[in-house]
Design a protein with these regions (language model features):
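FIC/Doc superfamily catalytic core
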Residues: 1-280
Length: 280
């Protein structure tokens, strides 16, 4: 794990130097917002691609791609506003008020539809009033689990303030605990990933974006917490996912730069050859 942490820390410095600090803050925030929203919602079954998510960000509901539902569009738009809310509140500690407001924004236009057949109505920003299940997992007594939420938030904030544990480890451990509390009627996965990134951003770390293509690996890492009584697999997954993304973006930027330079050299050579021919 120490080698992985060291590799991550070295790469973060390179990533900031070569990628994030070279872009304007506004552009980098929007770039991350689109990627994160598209992939986080894709994990939950949303079919919007990154390009379609970008179009939705730029044009809103006036340009919903063919074959996409209004529910999917609202899910993405709500994710945008929840993410932007957290960005504006990075100086605030982890509290129930922050968590509930983020959930309210995240599910504002989708919760009533998704829970329309519930006997008891669910409201955005309010805890579940029934026990929860997801996939093949049945969670514990909802009242007992909800009582643990303030404790989780408080202990996570204390560890953050101490500065003794790596931010990625804190983000992963919080995520693992939170997902098994599952305190809201819907949106727990998206909210958990938002709050993990809130933790990382508070410590000036790059955003963790779990690609939709890695959904099964991600779910397996979460299940290991219950199966093996350890969050080591999730911590490892968080580190490796972030490392892979940073390496890919650094390499992509390098290749695009080199290709552009080679292209310009080709143009100059062609122009030089044409000039030579015209002189004959």
């Amino acid at each position: 794990e120490d080698k992985l942490i060291s590799r991550y820390d070295i790469l973060v410095n390179r990533y900031k130097e070569l990628v994030s600090e070279k872009l304007s803050r506004k552009d980098f925030i929007e770039y991350n917002e689109i990627l994160f929203s598209a992939h986080s919602c894709a994990i939950e079954g949303n079919s919007f691609s990154v390009d379609e998510t970008r179009t939705l960000k730029e044009k809103g509901l006036g340009m919903i791609p063919k074959g996409k539902t209004l529910l999917e569009a609202f899910e993405i738009l709500d994710h945008f506003q929840a993410y932007e809310y957290l960005l504006k509140n990075l100086d605030r500690p982890l509290t129930e008020e922050l968590l509930k407001e983020t959930h309210r924004l995240l599910t504002e236009h989708t919760l009533s539809y998704k829970t329309q057949y519930d006997e008891i109505p669910s409201n955005p920003g309010e805890y579940t009033t029934v026990d929860m299940c997801a996939g093949d997992t049945i969670f514990g007594d909802h009242e007992q689990l909800i009582k643990q939420v303030p404790r989780l938030l408080q202990s996570t904030q204390q560890v953050l303030d101490s500065g003794k544990i790596h931010p990625m480890i804190i983000a992963a451990r919080f995520h693992g605990f939170y997902e098994y509390l599952h305190p809201f009627r819907d949106g727990n996965g998206r909210l958990g990933r938002l709050m993990s990134n809130f933790i990382l951003l508070k410590k000036e770390q790059p955003l963790l974006i779990i690609p939709g293509s890695q959904r099964e690996e991600y779910i397996t890492a979460l299940k290991y917490i219950k199966k093996e009584r350890t969050d080591e697999f999730l911590i490892d997954f968080f580190f490796r996912t972030s490392i892979k993304r940073m390496e890919q973006e650094i390499e992509e930027k390098k290749n695009l730069t080199e290709n552009f330079i080679r292209g310009m050299e080709f143009v100059r050579n062609v122009k030089s050859s044409n000039d030579d021919i015209s002189e004959i």
